[in-house]
């Protein structure tokens, strides 16, 4: 705040006290409203998330971000970061490329496919997050991972994963890839995850359609421990119907279902 007049600094402090927003957001909102405190706070409360994101974007040093992209870009194709660049990117963050943290970053970048970021995905993604250095991104990661506790955001993350994981041009997701990603994103969230994966590997052995992928999350959220609340007449994919038929004797200790 050292470049501000004392009267402006006072307004920044008042804005922060009133809204609980950070200094960067406060300065952005006040400058957008010509330092009229009442109008700035009204604007913030009408759309706090949007204004916070806008202030984050404006704080990014574009030249610094371009230099950072240059560290990772593919030497054969300057419009993307390839496998080697992704590995360096993960190393700089001290992350395993197969970790859920890297998948969260890919989600935030809206990456189209595994093992690469396009130039646009990287630059737009980092800008949206307000990051122009790996230090900033690393510091932000815990907050990004916390977003997965929000039901709507996790659903978006989960559905993004299907598109990200499948081969471009294919409608379905290869079974082995689906199982690997389910282990990553549904561990601790879907009580029948191990049983589901065993069932697929033993009895399905085919690719997974998008509809089945998406509805498995709904199934996992609603199904009872003994599966007694499953409605065979509901609009579930056949694969989930078959799984319930396979799994019920297992989860009920071998007893036959009355349904």
UniProtKB/Swiss-Prot annotation:
Primary residence: cytoplasm
One Gene Ontology MF term: ubiquitin conjugating enzyme binding
InterPro entries the record matches: DCN-prot, DCN1-like_PONY, PONY_dom, UBA-like_sf
Occurrences of domain UBA-like (ranges): 8-45
Keywords assigned: Cytoplasm, Nucleus, Phosphoprotein, Ubl conjugation pathway
Domain DCUN1: 60-248
Tissue: Mostly expressed in liver, kidney and brain.
Alphabetical list of CDD domains matching this protein: UBA_DCNL2
Domains as described in the record: The DCUN1 domain, also known as PONY domain, mediates the interaction with different cullins. The DCUN1 domain mediates the interaction with the N-terminally acetylated NEDD8-conjugating E2s enzyme leading to the NEDD8 transfer from N-terminally acetylated NEDD8-conjugating E2s enzyme to different cullin C-terminal domain-RBX complexes; the neddylation efficiency correlates with the DCUN1D5-cullin and DCUN1D5-E2 interaction affinities.
Protein name per the record: DCN1-like protein 2
Record gene name: DCUN1D2
